[in-house]
Amino acid sequence: ALGVDESHRMDTGNPGDRVYTRDLFTLEQSPRLGAGIMEMTDTTFPWTLNYDEMDYVVSGRLDVLIGGEKISAGPGEVLYIPKGSAIRFSVTGHARFLYFVYPADWQSQTGG
């Protein structure tokens, strides 16, 4: 089973946040479409997407705060977040979800 551990912890700028991400493929393996696992526990953090993202919730509930509204997904449900969105990811308790991003090399497009 694919999982995450402390080596996959994401730096959100807040040391109390518990966010873990693990890419499933390298850019060499999948140069256009990125995919990975994300797990969060009792955390809310801001994020601006310069890529399109779909999140498939495996367990728990994922809330995305966007433009003053909250969209939520539970197990077996999918969220779509369009490129250019300034959001806040939020989880109460624990959630595990798969993310799919296009383009896969979004980090090289941030300008830094």
Model-predicted segments: where are they?
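Short glycine/serine/proline-enriched coil/turn segments at secondary-structure junctions
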Residues: 29-30, 46-47, 89
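Short acidic-glycine-tyrosine-enriched beta hairpin
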Residues: 67-84
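A short, N-terminal "cap"/entry segment at the start of jelly-roll beta-barrel domains
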Residues: 1-34
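Ligand-binding loop in jelly-roll beta-barrel domains
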Residues: 83-107
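Conserved strand-loop elements at the edges of beta-sheets that form or border functional pockets
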Residues: 49, 56, 75, 83, ...
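Conserved hydrophobic/aromatic positions in well-ordered beta-strands
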Residues: 25, 34-38, 55, 98
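Short, charged, solvent-exposed linker or helix-capping segments at domain edges/interfaces
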Residues: 109-112
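Short, conserved beta-strand element in jelly-roll/cupin
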Residues: 39-42, 48-66
